[in-house]
């Protein structure tokens, strides 16, 4: 696992493929809940056979996909349990699940005002430029 929304899988022909989970954005590793999100994803799927449903490529040409373990949408699981945001800029698939996690104060929603990863990245980028 690279982080809570990116995985590396061994595909046919023993080729390692990096996949960005479609429709979600997990906290960055150095953010609050970043390591928890990564560890949750890892404990859920590491070493298991998953079903990958490609959805396209992102602006960085990374493969995007929904991943399933025994018919469970893992992307949805991460959002619904408060380990990731619904990435509504690119997909509306998981809005209901984010609202559920917020209402029940699950995972990162235990924090009064969690910082979305896109704001964290933007602030980090600004800081590097100066």
Regions found by a protein language model. Name each.
Residues 1-130:
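Small beta-barrel nucleic-acid-binding modules, primarily SNase/OB-fold domains
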